[in-house]
Swiss-Prot record:
Positions bound to CTP: 13, 148-150, 188-193, 224
Reactions listed under catalytic activity: UTP + L-glutamine + ATP + H2O = CTP + L-glutamate + ADP + phosphate + 2 H(+); L-glutamine + H2O = L-glutamate + NH4(+); UTP + NH4(+) + ATP = CTP + ADP + phosphate + 2 H(+)
Pathway: Pyrimidine metabolism; CTP biosynthesis via de novo pathway; CTP from UDP: step 2/2
PROSITE patterns in the cross-refs: GATASE_TYPE_1
Record-given protein name: CTP synthase
Gene name for this UniProt entry: pyrG
């Protein structure tokens, strides 16, 4: 019988529900249990694909091409599993499906309501995950905060699941904040008490309360929370700010959270073997070198917009025993005149993915600086496209060369739409999305990084390199070092006369893991260390 764990949040959002869920998933997996994890988001968008990164952080892409919440990145990195489109459910998806069924006549003329139709659809998404994966445990994180009007159907659905499958097969974890009032020198449990009261008014009694805090939580405070929230003091789990996120599973294990979960769910499993994870955390906390990477983007004021890129850089750093210091460089403030001053202290330059025409010239200036001054450069998606534009302008001398996405009337459309994309009007879900193979050219830096000539990577883009310019580019020294297996689509370019200048059309950051860094990131950080 599959067991179900639901993680809710109270008091404030962005409290760490995703990290808690991912960390618990890691512990349970290391106890020999099969784990699947999913995120329910109460917003009405079908997915975050068309949302501004300022609104929602990065869009995380799964193997099957789903554009999902960034928490799925945490899940994949912590638990080391590959999720799919069923792992992220939104209000928009659920309502779309229910309306589609109503139009088909599936409800036999009945009045379609939030209860039971919306809640049944939500429950089906949970049970579908169990059917498709046959996992021992399904962990479902409910986005938002208890008390939000948008969350009510989700909370009602997970309340009903307890009746559907039995109390011994369901566990509720509530994550709350214990704020520290600096002026009073006190921590306050009242917000947690009120949040649990709100949750209980909706019919859900949490079995475990995870309290986020900056300061240690005393036993007296745990006893107080337990008394008012009707749980044992041992079921109040402290989650303090950590030096590294990857220490959270060890902190939860130390407080026996996984034991409490298994006892409640009436499961038996051996203790989690966490030696490798402990070694990883020890390594992360004791890095002996430092390397500075300039990350040039237009959303740098919200670092979550580049969360997976930053994590992949850190993973590569762990492998090189190096702490990654990221310079978050706003491309809107970079010009040809000031780029040398801005970049003078960086050991490597990375231009990540992005859309739209704002701040493009700042990125191109950074790429030119990296190429001319032999600074290691790594371009991802748009960072690859602009590398070819910069080369066309400044090496081939093609004046006004650009991407047709940015400048539709350009004479030299180095980057252009594929023919099959030209008549598409909708923005959502129409990109080249998900895992695709790429064939690597022998004797290139890309092959040196991967150690093989055939790889699979995740994509998220609409525009492609224009093959009309391929021969010109290669004759001038830009190597096309990877293509789609049929040779039609350019996947990686690099420079022959540069220590390390590699740019890829795909998003390699999505497959990086803390104990298994992605190959291009690993070699990029190595090149940056050599450039110190």
């Amino acid at each position: 019988m599959t067991k179900y764990i639901f993680v809710t949040g109270g008091v404030v959002s962005s409290i760490g529900k995703g990290i808690t869920a991912a960390s618990l998933g890691r512990l349970l997996k290391n106890r020999g249990l099969s784990v699947t994890i999913q995120k329910f988001d109460p917003y009405i968008n079908v997915d975050p694909g068309t949302m501004s990164p300022y609104q929602h952080g990065e869009v995380y892409v799964t193997d099957d091409g789903a554009e999902t919440d960034l928490d799925l990145g945490h899940y994949e990195r912590f638990i080391d599993i590959n999720l799919n489109k069923y792992s992220n459910v939104t209000t928009g998806k659920v309502y779309s499906e229910v309306i589609k069924k109503e139009r088909r006549g599936d409800y036999l003329g009945g009045t379609v309501q939030v209860i039971p139709h919306i809640t049944n659809e939500l429950k089906d998404r949970v049970f579908r995950a169990a059917r498709m994966t046959n996992s021992d445990i399904i962990i479902t994180e409910i986005g938002g905060t208890v008390g939000d009007i948008e969350s009510l159907p989700f909370l009602e659905a997970i309340r009903q699941i307890k009746s559907d499958v039995g109390a011994e097969n369901v566990l509720y974890i509530h994550t709350t904040l214990i704020p520290y009032i600096k002026a009073a020198g006190e921590m306050k449990t009242k917000p947690t008490q009120h949040s649990v009261k709100e949750l209980r008014s909706l019919g859900i009694q949490p079995n475990i309360i995870v309290v986020r805090t900056e300061q240690p939580v005393s036993q007296e405070m745990k006893d107080k929370i337990a008394l008012f929230c009707d749980i044992k003091a041992s079921e109040v789990i402290e989650s303090r700010d950590e030096e590294t996120l990857y220490n959270v599973p060890l902190s939860l294990q130390k407080q026996k959270m996984d034991d409490i979960v298994l006892e409640h769910l009436q499961l038996e499993a051996p203790q989690a073997e966490m030696t490798d994870w402990k070694n990883l955390v020890h390594r992360v906390k004791n890095l002996s070198k430092k390397v500075r990477i300039g990350l040039v983007g237009k959303y740098v004021s919200l670092q979550d917009a580049y969360l997976s890129v930053a994590e992949a850089l850190r993973h590569a750093g762990y492998d090189h025993d190096a702490e990654i210091e990221i310079d978050w460089i706003d491309s809107e403030k970079v010009t040809k005149e000031n780029v040398a001053e801005i970049m003078k202290d960086v050991d490597g330059i990375l231009v990540p993915g992005g859309f739209g025409d704002r701040a493009i010239e700042g990125k191109i200036a950074a790429i030119e600086y990296a190429r001319v001054n032999k600074v290691p450069y790594f371009g991802i998606c748009l960072g690859m496209q602009l590398a070819t534009v910069e080369f066309a302008r400044n090496v081939l001398g093609l004046e006004g060369a650009h991407s047709a996405e940015i400048e539709p009337e350009t004479k030299h459309n180095i980057i252009d739409l594929l023919p099959e994309q030209k008549n598409i009007e909708n923005m959502g879900g129409t990109l080249r999305l998900g895992l695709y193979p790429a064939r690597i050219k022998q004797g290139t830096k890309a092959e040196a990084a991967y150690g093989t000539t055939l790889v699979e990577e995740r994509h998220r883009h609409r525009y492609e390199f224009n093959n009309e310019y391929r021969e010109q580019m290669e004759e001038a020294g830009m190597i096309v070092s990877a293509t789609s297996p049929d040779g039609r689509l350019v996947e990686v370019v690099e420079l022959a006369d540069h220590p390390w200048f590699v740019a890829c059309q795909y998003h390699p950051e999505f497959i990086s893991r803390p104990n298994r860094p992605q190959s291009l990131f690993k070699d990029f950080v190595g090149a940056a260390l050599n450039n110190k």
